[in-house]
Amino acid sequence: MKIALTCSENNLGSPVDPRFGRAKGFFICDSESGESAYYPNVQNVGAVQGAGIQTAQNIINAGADAVVSGHCGPKAFKLLSAAGVKIFSAADCAVSEAVEKIKAGSLPEMSAADVEGHWV
């Protein structure tokens, strides 16, 4: 499974970023091969609007099967869900720890957006 995880640094020990659309970057980790790649999210960090939708589309284009973030807004949630991408919530853990938790089935899957649009 390809997992996209929000992060605040280009480091697997980085905490999962609580923001989705305005996260500083993402790791795409393959849970089967163990490979990972960092993708900066520079174009959306300071976006006036549409950061969640643009970030969601980038993650869909990268072929992710799941997303792990602290929070997810309504428009991004709708787009990711429509594309079949599962969304999981993780707070207070490192990216590498979140990967292990999702593999173990211990991360909660979100059933709806948990913040309003334009949450910063």
Model regions: which residues?
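Alpha-helical segments flanking ligand/cofactor-binding loops in enzyme cores
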Residues: Q57, F77-K78
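Non-catalytic interface/targeting segments
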Residues: M1-G50, Q54, N61-A62, S81-A83, ...
